[in-house]
Regions:
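A short beta-strand/loop micro-motif in the catalytic core of glycosyltransferases
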Residues: 57, 101-110
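Nucleotide-sugar donor phosphate/pyrophosphate-binding loop at the beta->alpha transition
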Residues: 35-45, 65, 82-101
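Glycosyltransferase donor-sugar binding loop
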Residues: 134, 160, 187-196
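Carbohydrate-associated surface elements
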Residues: 111, 133
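Active-site proximal beta-strand in glycosyltransferases
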Residues: 55-61, 66-85
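An amphipathic, basic-hydrophobic alpha-helix
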Residues: 6, 17-52, 93
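A conserved mid-protein helix/loop that constitutes part of the nucleotide-sugar donor-binding site
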Residues: 155, 159-178, 195-196
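Nucleotide-sugar donor-binding and catalytic loop/hinge architecture
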Residues: 141-156, 180-181
Length: 196
């Protein structure tokens, strides 16, 4: 948590957003989960680009959507919603109504689209369902098969992702070190590709 907090502070000071976000955090702290507020603040402190794009896509709700909305210049903007919007703790106030300005919004299921449309009814015309391209049933079936390699006993953690600095694997290494120092029998498996 300290490393994340330190990163948030540095980024917000670099982009001059610290004092603006401090008041935002203070005003919204009672009605919004802290992790949601931190994503709003992190998006305001993130790197900015002078490039104008034809299309900008926020592939996940929260900080990604806030960043694309507030800090990316693009002719068209699209957003994906992967979660039950209300259950996940998002609100229009937290979003600062950013989804109203997106040109297209894609939900990953009919249920997800329905919940989102309940919060943003005026976005109904630009809201579509775009199912995940992953065959979840095939994954469930493969999970039942015996492992090809023997796995360590104890707590097994699996991380799947692109191995780049932006993904923050360096932070995860510190977390793993803390678990090992506390004598937890933890084994961390990483699947991915990239420069790290």
């Amino acid at each position: 948590k300290f490393l994340l907090f330190k990163t948030v502070l540095i980024k917000n000071f670099c982009h001059g957003a610290f004092f603006h976000n401090l008041s935002y955090l203070f005003l919204n702290r009672k009605n919004t989960p802290l992790e949601k507020l931190l994503w709003r603040i992190v998006s305001d402190g993130s790197e900015r680009f002078d490039t104008h794009f034809d299309l900008a896509v926020s592939y996940i709700e929260g900080g990604s959507a806030y960043y694309v909305h507030d800090h990316v210049s693009a002719a068209k903007k699209a957003a994906f919603i992967h979660v039950d919007y209300v259950q996940a703790g998002y609100t229009r106030r937290l979003d600062k109504d950013c989804y109203v300005d997106f040109d297209r919004i894609f939900a990953v299921s009919d249920e997800t689209a329905g919940v989102f449309a309940g919060v943003y009814p005026e976005c109904q015309q630009k809201l579509s369902v775009f199912h995940n391209l992953i065959d979840t049933e095939a994954i469930r079936q493969k999970a039942l098969l015996p492992a090809e390699k023997s796995m360590h006993e104890g707590i097994r953690l699996l991380t799947v992702g692109r191995l780049t600095p932006q993904k923050g694997f360096d932070c995860a290494v510190y977390a793993l070190k803390l678990l090992l120092e506390k004598q937890y029998p933890v084994y961390w498996y990483i699947i991915g590709e990239g420069p790290e």
